[in-house]
Amino acid sequence: MRALVGDVERPFALASVSKLLTAYAALVATEEQTLALDEAAGPPGATVAHLLAHASGLGPTGELLAAPGTRRIYSNAGFETLAAHLAARSGIAFADYLAEAVLSPLAMGATRLVGSPAYGAEAPLGDLVAFAGELLSPRLLATETLALATSVAFPGLSGVLPGFGRQEHCDWGLGPELRDHKSPHWTGGANAPSSFGHFGQSGTFLLVDPVAALSVVLLTDRPFGEWAVGGWPALLDAVLADPVLAPPGR
């Protein structure tokens, strides 16, 4: 079942939800053999996989804070480095590659990358729902590739989840953030540990719960804050408790 509330055509700034789109383009590139997850990219010793999983050691603005694979350091600069690397390897501007590899095939015609590949996309609800559907049942990627991308990359790394503090096991996939057993967290207490997605500082999120076989997309123009810290988990638990939106036994 699909339930849409609000203006589905109005574009919203996605903020860091943009990283899911950037990561998906990079994953498509690996299947096209334009990139390899284990190829060198970013600081010495780092790979494409390190950049996707916030494990390259790069800090938020590009400073090297740790050796690759030793800490989970959330880094916009890492995703910008990844996009630049993909552009160099493909010979195509990253925004064009994203459009050709992801947006056009999913009929996301109103989505635009207007700034950083880490946080600069804009999209309406209808387009993000199409992308969420792809994450539930992939057509652009092999099932095995998406399964790898939504499994823990570089397990055991601690780090800070923006807005929610330090996590002893700050698990991340190859782009998506993984719910696992993080606490506190922006997902609902009833969401499966295998749930994955991303939220953005513009008050946006995209979450996929594979156990419930559902996805939830929220787009707002209210900056992330305490309203989201308390409200999003309650909202997601309410969705899971709704027998129409999340039928028992799915």
Region spans (language model):
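Active-site-proximal loop and beta-strand segments within enzyme catalytic domains
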Residues: 2, 6-96
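Short, hydrophobic secondary-structure boundary micro-motifs
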Residues: 37-39, 60-64, 111-114, 143-144, ...
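Catalytic loop of the DD-peptidase/beta-lactamase superfamily, centered on the K-T-G motif
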Residues: 1-13, 18, 70-71, 87-92, ...
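Short acidic/histidine-centered micro-motifs embedded in hydrophobic/aromatic stretches
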Residues: 44, 54, 100-105, 148-152
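Secretory-pathway/luminal and periplasmic proteins that interact with or process carbohydrate-rich
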Residues: 57-61, 106-113, 154-161
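Sec-exported extracytoplasmic/periplasmic mature domains
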Residues: 30-31, 53-57, 103, 107, ...
